[in-house]
């Protein structure tokens, strides 16, 4: 561990020290055309190439002296430490909507595996064909025999950004918007509670997965140690943002304000980080289509007051960002430039979804050449990673990482 604290994120751009990722696995090979939509994919990736691309991405980070941790490895280690596979399985199976005898049948089958194989099967999905045939006793079992899974695969797990997010020395363990992703944050909960790297750290949970409203990490940006920017999007509910703000104001000694920015509720703009990311002290990449021609959009400043929350509506997005960062001006670098066709194409392929690994230094997909050239022209050091298969899941370098530790900015 490189710092005393297991978690420390006080900006989007501080030197990245430790990051959590998930290498794409057999869960991607359980996607079929019939279930693309429900599993939140537009196409079926080629796993072998996807893994090569992800390995190159991880190597790019390691080459910059970033410690890369793997979700699947930490989850298995945490499960071994917890010494209670049955309780963990019961929770996972219950949230997979398996009940009655089928739940017991699935649990007994999975209990026969060691921790590594159990975690792998829970992530990849459990096909009905894997378990020996048994007599069906109930109507729902007989009517549902065409559906191939006892437990659905979790192909979005390689987007580790969304199930949880570190803010300061604490974390949000998120209630995901889509049912296909709800179980993902159970693995984060397991790791933080039982893995020896985290279990003795008394880590505050600012927002838990039992919350009634959805919140996802792709909408959570830590601008500085006093300010969190949260997108109200297709995946994050305004009520979740308000509850998060109240929790932070009551329990975090440093957070002074939460900014809520409203973005269109569309799949292409599913999270704030698909249209807006921080790349340097006063520089951001932005998809121009989220603002009107005057550069305006709805942004709300939430601050603590004597009567609870004080909410101030604003429209001048760029000015608000400059004010909270105490910068005279902010440079917005347009994803894809000024050409609306190029901008739309490169945003779709995550041209705005940069991962800052240090101030003025980012990782991007190689396919977004116009956006990458614009970043370089603005003085940003760009590391390009191969992306033909990774991009099929509709997420970029920021989406594929959960930063755990960054250096504090001086």
Swiss-Prot record:
<comment type="similarity">
    <text>Belongs to the arginine deiminase family.</text>
</comment>
<dbReference type="GO" id="GO:0019547">
    <property type="term" value="P:arginine catabolic process to ornithine"/>
</dbReference>
<dbReference type="GO" id="GO:0019546">
    <property type="term" value="P:arginine deiminase pathway"/>
</dbReference>
<dbReference type="GO" id="GO:0016990">
    <property type="term" value="F:arginine deiminase activity"/>
</dbReference>
<dbReference type="GO" id="GO:0005737">
    <property type="term" value="C:cytoplasm"/>
</dbReference>
<keyword id="KW-0378">Hydrolase</keyword>
<keyword id="KW-0963">Cytoplasm</keyword>
<protein>
    <recommendedName>
        <fullName>Arginine deiminase</fullName>
        <ecNumber>3.5.3.6</ecNumber>
    </recommendedName>
</protein>
<feature type="active site" description="Amidino-cysteine intermediate">
    <location>
        <position position="399"/>
    </location>
</feature>
<keyword id="KW-0056">Arginine metabolism</keyword>
<comment type="pathway">
    <text>Amino-acid degradation; L-arginine degradation via ADI pathway; carbamoyl phosphate from L-arginine: step 1/2.</text>
</comment>
<dbReference type="Pfam" id="PF02274">
    <property type="entry name" value="ADI"/>
</dbReference>
<dbReference type="InterPro" id="IPR003876">
    <property type="entry name" value="Arg_deiminase"/>
</dbReference>
